[in-house]
Amino acid sequence: MITSAAYVGAAVAEIAGCFAFWAWLRLGKSVWWLAPGMVSLALFAYLLTLVDSEAAGRAYAAYGGVYIIASLGWLWSVEGLRPDRWDLTGAAICLLGAAIILFGPRQI
């Protein structure tokens, strides 16, 4: 349960943090947008340390699937652009890869 919550929280924190930089550089928002953006990015990094995984790289790779879903949700809910069929097809392919990483049998 904590892994799922950590992944979702990390995705929201990462997207919000990166969007703060996007807003500053691309949308002409105040430089003050960077302060909460940096806090969000630090929170993102911390939350990924809570994931139950024996290897950081595997945790990050599996997180990629969560990030993609969260990014498409952000695209639709915050930016007002509905994901198209290519967004959804690409996401499905990536989610399959993330599932293989997460649930594949491991040699111990």
Swiss-Prot record:
Ranges in a coiled coil? none
Where does this protein chiefly localize? membrane
Spell out where the chain crosses the membrane. 5-25, 31-51, 61-81, 88-108
Alphabetized InterPro entries for the sequence:
UPF0060
What superkingdom heads the lineage? Answer: Bacteria
* A matching Pfam family: UPF0060
Q: Show the GO cellular component annotation of the record.
A: plasma membrane
* UniProt membrane topology term: Multi-pass membrane protein
Where can this protein be found? Cell inner membrane
Which keywords does this chain's UniProt record carry? Cell inner membrane, Cell membrane, Membrane, Transmembrane, Transmembrane helix
User: Record's family?
Assistant: Belongs to the UPF0060 family.
Record's HAMAP family?
UPF0060
Looking up PANTHER family in the UniProt record yields: UPF0060 MEMBRANE PROTEIN YNFA (PTHR36116:SF1)
What this protein is called in its record is UPF0060 membrane protein Nham_2004
Source organism per entry reads Nitrobacter hamburgensis (strain DSM 10229 / NCIMB 13809 / X14)
